[in-house]
């Protein structure tokens, strides 16, 4: 099952500071490289733990359909500068402050996942928060993508255990 960016929790209460707490699945963690996500990536737990602190401070972004800023359309990718993806058509709607690794039960069984914990700035994007609440209330899974890149020390190249391959590649060193 494709797990990326599945909303696990959105707090019920509007906070006076305008920040609505969220917990979102960032990606599934696999036992080995015989299983992978839709992009062919097999995230293993040890490498996920080794790199998970990069979630802290990671922006939560959205590209919107129109100026109402209610319905997300994509992630706003417009190109690349060297090995850095550029997202000029998206805005930062929140931020992740922490992470956790959790076992999450879904209709097809248990899944081990890396989750991001943070907030959406409801004071700036109230229609977007309402859209999320409505989708969750209707039982609709919200999906998105997580962009990861290589580290500065590796000139922006992601280092894969066993090298790059189409399916079952294991990211080892990344941001």
Predicted feature locations:
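Signature of dsDNA virion morphogenesis modules
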Residues: 1-175
């Amino acid at each position: 099952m494709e797990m990326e960016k599945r909303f696990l929790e959105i707090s019920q209460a509007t906070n006076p500071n305008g920040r609505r707490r969220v917990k979102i699945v960032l990606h599934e963690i696999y036992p080995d490289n015989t299983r992978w996500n839709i992009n062919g990536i097999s995230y293993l737990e040890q490498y996920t733990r080794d790199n998970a602190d990069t979630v802290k401070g990671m922006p939560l972004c959205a590209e919107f359909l129109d100026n109402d800023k209610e319905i997300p359309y994509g992630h706003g990718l417009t190109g690349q500068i060297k090995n850095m993806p550029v997202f000029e058509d998206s805005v930062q709607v929140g931020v992740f402050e922490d992470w956790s690794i959790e076992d999450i039960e879904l209709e097809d069984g248990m899944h081990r996942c890396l989750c991001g914990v943070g907030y959406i700035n409801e004071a700036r994007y109230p229609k977007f928060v309402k859209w999320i609440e409505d989708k969750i209330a209707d039982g609709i899974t919200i999906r998105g993508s997580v962009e990861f890149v290589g580290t500065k020390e590796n000139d922006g190249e992601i280092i894969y255990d066993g090298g790059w391959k189409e399916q079952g590649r294991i990211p080892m060193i990344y941001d």
